[in-house]
């Protein structure tokens, strides 16, 4: 499997995209809202992508719930994780049900992965906000662990993001290069706690680092940093799963240079799969510029659950879970 995950422009593939998908460096496709019209169209698009690639291909989407849910009409509405605590003593069970429902519905369309859950603490970052479970690390651990259990029950792997924590910076890494000036001691006592606890518990199959520079510790964003990915994540915390880069076309990645330089820097730091989204020229530059890229280990994230929507929606679990999640969402989401 190649180490580059890229996007496609619309609800159908064009000729250039079919050719790009056959490139040996391409190992995945990330889908967005613009790729979705309805469920039957989505299933047809996914089938066409897999046929065009003619090789194992990881298909992913950001489908966390709340404001980050790419497919809406026809899919269950997943609430933002930041309001699950309102279910009080039922919050943990509700988190499991949300994780299962989200994953099961995507798998029923042959989509392998949702980049979830968010493990960032809610500490004033607008770009994170209610995407976070809580400002309290222990509550994040409890609810994220339950959400992941639901994903795993459905047959989907979990991706924790954004390591080592994006919640304490206000800048949006899509638009600029955020800087976090805190010490190691403060970061380890707060933002790193969910990662530190969930990794040895075997909950996290993949991790996505932040395009944030932690100035007291390294001059590179975490996704380009051997300190963060090799010394801390692999070494200190013993993480053996897949590391995704965040989108290499984001402004927060520009410090590493042009697109091929960004891709090589991420690979050198220890990323297994690179994301290049919303910039066809940038993705093509990476394909042309990467010299003999290593094969990705991300094939382990492919789903073995060949789902079927009609079969899924006829089960009592889907009916009961969908009903409970929708009642909660309608009560607490405007």
From Swiss-Prot:
Pathway: Cell wall biogenesis; peptidoglycan recycling. Its EC number is 3.2.1.52. It is found in: Cytoplasm. NCBIfam families: PRK05337.1. This is Beta-hexosaminidase. One of its GO terms (molecular function) is beta-N-acetylhexosaminidase activity. GO terms for cellular component: cytoplasm. Substrate binds at residues 62, 70, 131, 161-162. Keywords: Cell cycle, Cell division, Cell shape, Cell wall biogenesis/degradation, Cytoplasm, Glycosidase, Hydrolase, Peptidoglycan synthesis. The record marks 172 as: Important for catalytic activity. Gene3D superfamilies: Glycoside hydrolase, family 3, N-terminal domain. Signal peptide: none annotated. It comes from the Bacteria. The keyword Phosphoprotein does not apply. It catalyses: Hydrolysis of terminal non-reducing N-acetyl-D-hexosamine residues in N-acetyl-beta-D-hexosaminides.
